[in-house]
Amino acid sequence: MRIKNKIKKRIIELIELAYITARKGDLELAREYIKLAEMYSRKGRIKIPLKYKRMFCRKCYTPLITGVTERRRIRSKILIRTCLICNWQRRYVLSRNKGSNKEN
């Protein structure tokens, strides 16, 4: 296995472990896991997959868990995700999936 694949696999493991740790209540340890994953990403020049990149706050590195560390609001087809620790906000445009409401 190539070294970049090993690093990417480790980054994903760390982010998933951070998410599990945060659910158990240890936010400081979860932040450290995410900071470590970010460091691996920078040093290895590897992009974090979008699915995992959206799992944590980019300002304070807290795993975003709806209702615990994150608030989600939908306003006029825009999803607003707010970190409850540092009040950082991220907006995503919501679009209808192609082919989901096709009439036959």
UniProtKB/Swiss-Prot annotation:
Residues annotated for Zn(2+) binding in this entry: 57, 60, 83, 86
Cofactor note: Binds 1 zinc ion per subunit.
Needed co-factor(s): Zn(2+)
Short name of any one Pfam family annotated for the protein: Rpr2
Top-level taxon in the UniProt lineage: Archaea
GO annotation (BP), single: tRNA 5'-leader removal
Compartment(s): Cytoplasm
Transmembrane segments: none
EC numbers: 3.1.26.5
Keyword Transport: no
Catalytic activity: Endonucleolytic cleavage of RNA, removing 5'-extranucleotides from tRNA precursor
Family stated for the protein in its record: Belongs to the eukaryotic/archaeal RNase P protein component 4 family.
Self-association and partners: Consists of a catalytic RNA component and at least 4-5 protein subunits.
Protein name per the record: Ribonuclease P protein component 4
Lineage of source species: Archaea, Thermoproteota, Thermoprotei, Sulfolobales, Sulfolobaceae
Gene name as annotated: rnp4
